[in-house]
């Protein structure tokens, strides 16, 4: 079990900083529409989200609404975004199955709420919308802010080889993403060789539990909110489809493997074999016993050089430094490494018997700029749900 710990130490102990959030009520204890502001649960909540990460948060809110022991949520309604899928995004699917009222952005309904909750929503919220909620809008963000602000924090956590990550519950500010005060923050170690999808599953449960904890003591949590540090700010922009094209001459074997772990569940890494696009489906680290093979030592080979290693039944591809193993690929159909050798590599060697072996290589696939913009398969957290 991964045990979370506080990201920010004990500096806040014994202190009760001035609340940097929107005041929960006017002097008369009423919100802008004349309704009396609640000072304790149960809360009326509007949830805005899209993907599997967000669905876990919605599930926790739903369970809190229907809880018999302690009534934390009185009212729960949902906002999601349009989807090309007929079934809709995971949040919409869950809302419909659970018979929760659901709206499609920019429609947010016309009901009265105490607090808004956002998770993986990907839309900037206006100040006018934020001010409709007496307690503002909370964001469940899967990173330790201010590291990895933006729409793809989990992907960038894996892509950059972070060993520690976490979840931040923050209060939203208008006009910019992920800059508001931190209400709660916890860290966990990143499991070795974890994919973005696997890490998302861990963080989604942590974030859902943290949100429920904040809602149980909402006024106090808001009052104890702290500004994000000015140091350590990094950004997690969406990742374009072109990122999936392996640059053998520029990327190390570790970088290629991290790229596969980060986006391989969403879009496979791609390369070029004799002018044909090849998708690399199953990439693995090459162990020392394989690297000791005489075929791989004592000769200089060009990055992209590919050879079939019969004992391990893998394709071995040379990177900028070192080798990466490939167990399966896709051309017109999915092929094992052995299938690829029998159907393509062996035929190349027969046809080019006098060529230097280093000419048998994968080359970097370069997508036209227009194609990248057209497909704009921009990868963010919500893409993990597709």
Swiss-Prot record:
Its EC number is 2.1.2.9. Keywords: Mitochondrion, Protein biosynthesis, Transferase, Transit peptide. It catalyses: L-methionyl-tRNA(fMet) + (6R)-10-formyltetrahydrofolate = N-formyl-L-methionyl-tRNA(fMet) + (6S)-5,6,7,8-tetrahydrofolate + H(+). It is an enzyme of class 2 (transferase). It is found in: Mitochondrion. One of its GO terms (cellular component) is mitochondrion. Transmembrane segments: none annotated. GO terms for biological process: conversion of methionyl-tRNA to N-formyl-methionyl-tRNA. Signal peptide: none annotated. InterPro entries: Fmt (IPR005794), Formyl_trans_C (IPR005793), Formyl_transf_N (IPR002376), Formyl_transf_N_sf (IPR036477), Met-tRNA-FMT_N (IPR041711). GO terms for molecular function: methionyl-tRNA formyltransferase activity. Belongs to the Fmt family. Methionyl-tRNA formyltransferase that formylates methionyl-tRNA in mitochondria and is crucial for translation initiation. Composed of an N- and a C-terminal domain. The N-terminal domain carries the tetrahydrofolate (THF)-binding site and the C-terminal domain is presumably involved in positioning the Met-tRNA substrate for the formylation reaction. This is Methionyl-tRNA formyltransferase, mitochondrial. It comes from Mus musculus. The gene is Mtfmt.
